């Protein structure tokens, strides 16, 4: 699917960063037909949320399984092979060469798309230097993107700040997925490299991941609808 073929409604991925399956299912019910794509991360996955992937798929929803796998290639390959049976659309791995290579091997001929996480959106230059990286955020993101493209990764996860540069590097051959999205007036929380939905889409993002601004809202459906409307405006839809 080319970027032009992605409907505005399908570009919003709501992060179900909730404490239980019951809480997640209640949120899904409140959002109804407004949301077609959900993210399941550590918190929900380890609270019994993995079977929810298949249940959502049966309802025609898509699931982004955000597990950020990072291990030796063989272990990742075996894990990803098992994950292909869950019915998820996207799966994240960290953008290290052995990890990415193993994920592509484990995916095989399935429909699962592998996304490489470049640099977490909670990191800035100081955090990278403290962790021993000599490259800055932009340089490291671009280097990892180039490696991911060579290894056959389907898409990249980065902050919206790097999307424009990444689009120039990978063209439209890879999907660009951006967390760190905050509607105007929302608290940034623990995110350090953030952007509004419209600006992120204009910069070149294909999919936007939004969690707390939606799931912690008094009226989550209204917030999701507003974000999708902003996406549509940015696309000229």
Swiss-Prot record:
Keywords: Decarboxylase, Lyase, Pyrimidine biosynthesis. CDD domains: OMP_decarboxylase_like (cd04725). It holds the Pfam family OMPdecase. InterPro entries: Aldolase_TIM, OMPdecase, OMPdecase_AS, OMPdecase_bac, OMPdeCOase_dom, RibuloseP-bd_barrel. It is an enzyme of class 4 (lyase). GO terms for molecular function: orotidine-5'-phosphate decarboxylase activity. Pathway: Pyrimidine metabolism; UMP biosynthesis via de novo pathway; UMP from orotate: step 2/2. GO terms for cellular component: cytosol. One of its GO terms (biological process) is 'de novo' UMP biosynthetic process. Its EC number is 4.1.1.23. Gene3D superfamilies: Aldolase class I (3.20.20.70). HAMAP family: OMPdecase_type1_B. Homodimer. Catalyzes the decarboxylation of orotidine 5'-monophosphate (OMP) to uridine 5'-monophosphate (UMP). Belongs to the OMP decarboxylase family. Type 1 subfamily. This is Orotidine 5'-phosphate decarboxylase. It comes from Bradyrhizobium diazoefficiens (strain JCM 10833 / BCRC 13528 / IAM 13628 / NBRC 14792 / USDA 110).
